[in-house]
Amino acid sequence: MSIVKDMSLAPSGLQKIQWVRDFMPALSGIEERFRKEKPFAGLTIAVSVHLEAKTANLGLVLREGGADVHLTGCNPLSTQDDVAAAMAHLGVDTYGVHGVTPQEYEDLLVETLKCRPHLIVDDGGDLISLLGGRCADLGERLIGGCEETTTGIHRLIARE
């Protein structure tokens, strides 16, 4: 189940995602390989990134690889509501709303982690930080993850 601002925004988001797929083909070769090999079959991936068309495409590629993808924004001010609605429309569990409060943002992250992911793709370290604290009970299946930013790495090192 997704939490997005307004599902009626999906057509605009679908257009943006299609533009990325048409004019930014870097992931298309990987997607073709994933479609055949299904390297993530049986795995659940929680993805926290700037929720816009390019990163939405990454979520779709991971899904083609067999993953059960759960997508959220890593910054409530960068989340594009139409793209979030489009991903929900496409069947990807999406938790993202532009302009939410800090508490609402954390609640969306928690909703994302309720999938009990095997893998995490994080930008800023918010998902991984929650698994090390408030949501420790949701990380029992976790086998790996990646953090995009130096800031996120520093946050995680500080938790040691």
Give the label of every model feature segment:
Residues 1-160:
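N-terminal ligand-binding/catalytic initiation module
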